[in-house]
Amino acid sequence: MTAAEAEAAALIERRGNVEVITINRPAARNAVNGAVSIAVGDALERANGDPDVWAVVITGAGDKSFCAGADLKAISRRENLYHPDHGEWGFAGYVHHFIDKPTIAAVNGTALGGGTEIALASDLVVAAESASFGLPEVKRGLVAAAGGVFRIVDHLPRKVAVELLFTGDPISAADAARWGLINQVVPDGTALDAAIALAGRVTANAPLAVQVSKRVAYGVDHGVITDEEPRWDRLFTEVKSLMRSEDAKEGPLAFAQKRRPVWKGR
């Protein structure tokens, strides 16, 4: 991967004290590959160290998809989807990459799987009316391993959250707002503008006070949310075991072959 490829995978724009990061793979429904993780992760890190950036907005290019999750073609090529120098930042260089600056997801379309996990990792979420959210990994014999499997339970009533986890079914933006998963639902085509407007309300305040509020609210120590670390450890242990199962191989294979999976429970 060249530096130019990594740079093109996400567009960076400054709007006053707000940095806008746009995942720039509309032809692939903004699916995450290694280039996206590098571009997004590096942009976040620069924003965190820049005293003139007071908030960050993340969105997807185009008007169909915010992020379709992991790039299955990249996975089939055995491409590393994570930042090569900062694997600890997690999926998209984002989901385990805490920054002091407030983050806002402008969900301009479908946000299934990893797209929902990016939204869950954001402080605030603005979504277009046609947006949808969900964690469909169980339909492929997998699990929402970018933090979604435990964060969804923090964001929704438990019964609602586990229904989404167990069925893999999506919910609309309206339902996501009703349950408190997102902050605002706005007309299609206006999610980014609405997110920037929300960022403006945040950046109207004293930036250091906002950053302290964020760190204390999340219980951050040495750049990580301390209460989440045992859950990440448990998730990684469970995923390693799951990936050795026949079902974990059958799900992606059936998807690639466009047929119903045949589960064996082993």
Task: Name each model feature, range by range.
Residues 39-49, 72-108, 140, 150, ...:
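An acidic, glycine-rich surface segment that forms the CoA-thioester-binding/catalytic face
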Residues 1-63:
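Conserved CoA-thioester-binding segment of acyl-CoA-metabolizing enzymes
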Residues 92-100, 106, 112-166, 179, ...:
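CoA-thioester-processing core
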Residues 63-67, 112, 217:
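Short, active-site-adjacent cap segments at secondary-structure transitions
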Residues 124, 163, 167-169, 175, ...:
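Well-ordered beta-strand positions
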Residues 26, 126-131, 182-230, 246, ...:
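C-terminal long alpha-helix characteristic of the crotonase
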